[in-house]
Amino acid sequence: MIQTKLKGMGVALITPFKEDESVDYDALIRMVDYLLQHNADSLCVLGTPAETPTLTEEEKKTIKKMVIDRVNGRIPILLGVGGNNTRAIVETLKNDDFTGVDAILSVVPYYNKPSQEGIYQHYKAIAEATELPIVLYNVPGRTGVNMTAETTLRIARDFNNVIAIKEASGNITQMDDIIKNKPENFNVISGDDGITFPLITLGAVGVISVIGNAFPREFSRMTRLALQGDFANALTIHHKFTELFNLLFVDGNPAGVKSMLNAMGMIENKLRLPLVPTRITTFEAIRKVLNELNIKC
């Protein structure tokens, strides 16, 4: 079952750019290979760290195909299919080719600031438009509206193909409420690297990670240890990354993780406007921590 396959550390894949801001497809393939070789349990394509709003439709299609072909069924692939135009999402789900996609990740509608009933009706329309498994994504810091535990549980109970939520509200009480009251066939996945460990101790099944782009082996190990109940060793790894968690987002996402990957010699430190690279002070702080962790820069 796809619920089982989505346990562990998924990675929300970045989009590498060249200096001229064109997509660096060679670097993209290197990233996919790196993640496959270092224990990523799933990949999320065209999510937030991919800078999806800045990509053309042709670029999105090419990225999707290249990643699916490279992964070749070795791990599950989630595809970001979200927005604030419900009708457009429904049309996409009905008309696009989802061969090789194991589930879709669909964010709570942003900017429009719908009511809880509007959020429910949005996901109802999506769930009824596809047989693909759906992972909800609650990230009020970006969308401007929080999907409450009550709404999440209502959706989870009413639609069998809604299999999980990526929770990034930062509200542990809300997340715990979902975990305690969820249907058996519905899982909670952390959407925030920094709270992955504590959330797993409450019953979450893993994370869709940003920092996993740079450190898949260690972050996957932490996640697996926590899921196995080896909290002491998992906590040691969690503490190892505490400072990097903070640096990851101080200048925005994916600027932080792109600086990390650049310091490690893996990609150009390039983003598309309106996003810009981290400040020099942040970049140097990242290099300092990486050196302290004995990671090649």
Question: Which ranges hold each PLM region?
Answer:
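Active-site beta->alpha loop and helix N-cap motifs at the rims of alpha/beta catalytic domains
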Residues: 2-144, 154
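Glycine-rich phosphate-binding "P-loop"
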Residues: 138-139, 161-162, 272-273
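Alpha-helix N-capping/helix-start residues
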Residues: 19, 25, 57, 149, ...
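Short secondary-structure transition/capping segments
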Residues: 55-58, 91, 116-119, 147-149, ...
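Basic, gly/Ser/Thr/Pro-rich low-complexity segments located predominantly at protein N termini
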Residues: 13-15, 26, 52-55, 85-87, ...
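C-terminal alpha-helical cap/extension of soluble enzyme domains
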Residues: 5-16, 34, 38-40, 49, ...
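Catalytic alpha/beta core domains of metabolic enzymes, predominantly
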Residues: 128-129, 142-249
